[in-house]
Amino acid sequence: MKYLQKNISKYRLTRNVLLLGYKKEAENYIHNCNLFVLTSKYEGLPNVLIEAQKFSIPIISSNCPTGPKEILLNGKLGDLFKVGDYKDLARKVILFNLKKTNLQKKSLLAKKYLFRFDAFINSSQYEKLINKI
């Protein structure tokens, strides 16, 4: 974290890059973002990506095991980069800042797919499956 803070200051990005750490009410912050970046090495179901989709925030995510690739439909709903390939991540962030349209289109499309994570819909589907047994 200190390394990141040092580089944020070094490159005079303190007004553009915030490292907030864990926040209990992430929704209070996420809707103000222009871009959401997930750099995880491992995830289960990264709810934070679903939250970013809810607010139509463009997403760039590591293609870590289980989660981002499925949520972003293999890159259809956001951009993916190989875990640890920070040059590709940097390229994608720069490209987003220069030409936002492609990633913004993906983020708007993502909102149409949010029903996949609706608890009521999923519980109804599970109930139907259980009743078939």
Predicted regions, residues:
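Nucleotide-activated donor-binding/catalytic signature segment of Leloir-type glycosyltransferases, i.e.
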Residues: L4-G21
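Aromatic "clamp/platform" in nucleotide-sugar-dependent glycosyltransferases that forms part
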Residues: Y22, K41
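A short alpha->beta transition loop at the rim of the catalytic pocket in nucleotide-sugar-dependent
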Residues: N34, S56
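Short acidic/histidine- and often glycine-rich active-site loop of Leloir-type glycosyltransferases
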Residues: E51, C64-G75, D79-L80
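Short hydrophobic beta-strand element within catalytic cores of glycosyltransferases
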Residues: P58-S62
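Conserved acidic donor-binding segment of nucleotide-sugar-dependent glycosyltransferases
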Residues: L73-Y86, L95-K100
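A short, well-ordered alpha-helix in the C-terminal region of glycosyltransferases
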Residues: D88, L95, N102-R116, Q125
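C-terminal alpha-helical cap of glycosyltransferases
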Residues: I94-L95, A119-I133
